[in-house]
Each structure stands twice: as structure tokens, then as C-alpha cells.
């Protein structure tokens, strides 16, 4: 009996009107993550997807890949058989090992015309297993093995252990955002969380050579590739902005404590213009409220005021550092993020950054320079390069 992979959809099942589009996007994303596996067959159902023709592949590796795809509730190894009791019983036996264990059977009928009801299916399959496997015992409360039987209109599906999927919504179903990506821990995690809500992403990062090194940029590129799993989770581009000219001019402002605030205001201005040009509907940052001096409410308001109500998403706003680090390890970005290469913000930070900036003071400081806006225009038009992550 040949196993198949059986996938149950996640939240998208709730979206009645948009179900067809949601499933279409999810199936496309699954095919992308499994693109290296040839000759697989995908059978799309109302609330499930079956993947067959798996004989030549490592099922564990395929399942590990599928666990990264947003929109999947759970994944399992299953058997698809004819709607004959004897076939269903044999499929149940595939999950039995040669050692003592407890089990329980659950059954559900989509096809109510099947000649046995759910209770009868459970009883007859359990009796068959007990007769053929003397080490088995029934435990309906805390079984070591739970066998699920689903009677469909065209077949029966039998599966055991459920492997939790990434849940969320299929990437690409909810538009596009531009992520301000640094080399730190937070923004890569923010990227994945925003993808979980069905948003596809591009990245922008800011470099300040010679103050930042090529290794720092290489680290950011590696992070972008890990976030997107080499562009299998979403087709993303990384835009690299050489910010050195602006940074050098901002260094001359009269209030050193506002240096980071002004730098971030220009980050936002550049990111907004780029977002509009790449048809992104929002910016995404890795800010977490109160985590560092520049991430207070006043600071966020002062920095975001340059955007004229362009949407900024901050998925980490209520997370503490330990939670963010835990997620970074889950997404395999943590070890890259802690590589010792400084980014623009860390190198440029004053000794005592203001935690209580205001819009009026920031705007007045920007007006001190007669050339700041001209340099900003030059940087946006001449100092941004695009890196394809594929």
C-alpha cells in the first residue's frame, strides 16, 4: 500500500467567497516549495490537498518543507483506498507497530450514503486491529495512536499522526509590503510574521560604506534568502540603498541626540517612495515598543510623521526580546542575525539618543542643512540597487 501526503487547509477555509482564490494561491505556494521534486501529482479538494506519486522521495523531507508554507493547518502521511471496509481496515493496520500501544479510531463521513455510519466504522476497524494485533489496547481518552478515517465521495482516507502546519494565510493573498530589513534579530522575524498574514514582501536595506562592510551586506542578503527560503516562500527582491551621503550630512546637525531620529525619518521617506514604485501597500518594520531608546511611542510618531499616512505595519510591537529570539530560532535566522557585523543604525547611534523626540524639533533640525533634501533626492534616484534573491 503506497502512502500519500494529506494536507488540511488552514484559516482560508473560513473565507467563503474567496475560497477558490485562496486555494489556488496555496496550491501554487506548495508547488513552489516542492519544486525540486519531479512528477508529483496534486489532487485539490474542498478542504484538503493530496500529494501522490511519492515513491522515489523521502517523505520526512517533503513534510519538513511543507511545514514552512503558510495556509496549512496540518500535514500527515495517509493512505487513499476504495470505500470498502476491508480496504479501510488494511489501511488502518499500516499504522500499527510491533509493540504494545494504546489506540483510538475516529471516523467521519462526507458521503452519508456509505453503508456504515461513523460509529460502525470505528467499531469494526477497532475490532479488526485488536484481532490482528494482540499488543494493542483501546484508550479513548489518552491514546498513544489516533487513527482517523474520512469517507469521501470518491474514496476513503486513513491517516495517523497530524503534523502541525504553519497555519496563517497563503503568502500573496493579502497584497504586498516592503520590509525595512537590517542585519539584526527583529526585522527578519517581523518579515515572517507579516508573511503569515498572507502578505508577499520585498526588502530594502541601508548601507553606509565605508562605515559598513561588504560582510555586513552579505549577511543581510543571507537573511533575506533565509526568510524567503531562497525565494520559494515568496518571490522577493532586495533593494540596497547606499545611505552614506545622507548619513554624513545628518552627522552635522546641532542636536546629536536626534541623529538616529533623523536618519530613520529619511529611511522612511526613501522606503515609502520605493514601496509605491514596486506597488507595495505598506511598510514593515521590526520595531518593538520600548525595546530600545528609539522605539518609544513619541519616537515612532516622530519618525512616521514623514509618511503622510502611508501604512506602517509593526508585527513585533507587543513582543518582548525573549519571544522574538525564540521565533528567530524557529525561522533559522537567529544565527545569521548575531554575526558580528554592524549595520548603519548601530554604527551611527549617539551616546544618549533622545527617547522623547517631537515632530517640530526634528523638522527644524532638518531645515538646518541647506543641502539635505537635495542629497536625499540624489540618494533615492542614484544610490539604490536591486538584488534578485532567486
Curated annotation (Swiss-Prot):
GO terms for molecular function: ATP binding; CCA tRNA nucleotidyltransferase activity; tRNA binding; tRNA-uracil-4 sulfurtransferase activity. ATP binds at residues 180-181, 205-206, 264, 286, 295. InterPro entries: Rossmann-like_a/b/a_fold, ThiI_AANH, ThiI_fer, ThiI_N, THUMP_dom, THUMP_ThiI, tRNA_STrfase, tRNA_sulfurtransferase_ThiI. Keywords: ATP-binding, Cytoplasm, Nucleotide-binding, RNA-binding, Thiamine biosynthesis, Transferase, tRNA-binding. Its EC number is 2.8.1.4. It comes from the Bacteria. Pathway: Cofactor biosynthesis; thiamine diphosphate biosynthesis. It holds the Pfam family THUMP. SUPFAM superfamilies: Adenine nucleotide alpha hydrolases-like, THUMP domain-like. PANTHER family: TRNA SULFURTRANSFERASE. Belongs to the ThiI family. This is Probable tRNA sulfurtransferase. It comes from Ureaplasma parvum serovar 3 (strain ATCC 700970).
Amino acid at each position: 500500500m503506497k502512502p500519500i501526503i494529506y494536507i488540511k487547509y488552514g484559516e482560508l477555509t473560513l473565507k467563503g467567497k474567496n475560497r477558490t482564490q485562496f486555494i489556488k494561491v496555496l496550491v501554487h505556494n506548495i508547488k513552489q516549495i516542492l519544486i525540486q521534486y519531479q512528477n508529483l501529482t496534486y489532487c485539490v479538494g474542498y478542504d484538503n490537498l493530496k500529494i501522490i506519486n511519492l515513491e522515489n522521495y523521502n517523505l520526512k523531507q517533503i513534510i519538513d518543507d511543507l511545514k514552512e508554507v503558510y495556509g496549512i493547518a496540518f500535514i500527515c502521511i495517509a493512505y487513499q483506498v476504495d470505500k470498502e471496509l476491508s480496504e479501510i481496515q488494511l489501511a488502518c493496520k499500516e499504522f500499527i507497530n510491533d509493540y504494545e500501544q494504546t489506540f483510538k479510531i475516529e471516523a467521519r463521513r462526507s458521503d452519508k450514503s456509505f453503508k456504515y455510519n461513523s460509529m460502525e466504522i470505528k467499531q469494526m476497524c477497532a475490532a479488526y486491529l485488536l484481532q490482528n494485533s494482540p499488543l494493542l489496547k483501546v484508550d479513548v481518552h489518552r491514546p498513544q495512536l489516533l487513527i482517523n478515517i474520512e469517507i469521501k465521495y470518491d474514496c476513503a482516507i486513513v491517516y495517523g499522526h497530524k503534523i502541525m502546519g504553519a497555519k496563517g494565510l497563503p503568502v500573496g493573498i493579502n497584497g504586498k509590503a516592503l520590509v525595512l530589513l537590517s542585519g539584526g534579530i527583529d526585522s527578519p522575524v517581523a518579515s515572517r510574521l507579516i508573511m503569515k498574514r498572507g502578505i508577499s514582501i520585498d526588502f530594502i536595506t541601508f548601507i553606509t560604506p565605508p562605515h559598513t562592510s561588504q560582510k555586513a551586506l552579505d549577511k543581510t542578503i543571507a537573511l533575506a534568502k533565509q526568510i524567503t527560503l531562497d525565494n520559494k516562500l515568496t518571490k522577493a527582491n532586495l533593494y540596497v540603498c547606499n545611505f552614506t551621503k545622507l548619513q554624513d550630512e545628518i552627522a552635522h546637525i546641532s542636536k546629536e541626540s536626534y541623529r538616529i531620529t533623523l536618519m530613520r525619518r529619511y529611511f522612511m521617506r526613501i522606503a515609502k517612495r520605493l514601496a509605491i514604485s514596486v506597488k507595495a501597500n505598506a511598510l514593515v518594520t521590526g520595531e518593538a515598543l520600548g525595546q530600545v531608546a528609539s522605539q518609544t511611542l513619541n519616537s515612532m510618531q516622530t519618525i512616521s510623521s514623514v509618511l503622510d499616512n502611508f501604512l506602517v505595519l509593526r508585527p513585533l510591537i507587543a513582543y518582548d526580546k525573549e519571544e522574538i529570539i525564540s521565533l528567530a530560532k524557529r525561522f533559522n535566522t537567529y544565527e545569521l542575525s548575531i554575526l558580528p557585523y554592524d549595520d548603519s543604525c548601530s554604527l551611527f547611534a549617539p551616546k544618549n539618543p533622545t527617547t522623547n523626540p517631537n515632530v517640530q524639533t526634528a523638522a527644524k533640525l532638518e531645515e538646518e542643512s541647506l543641502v539635505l533634501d537635495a542629497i536625499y533626492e540624489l540618494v533615492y534616484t542614484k544610490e539604490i540597487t536591486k538584488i534578485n534573491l532567486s
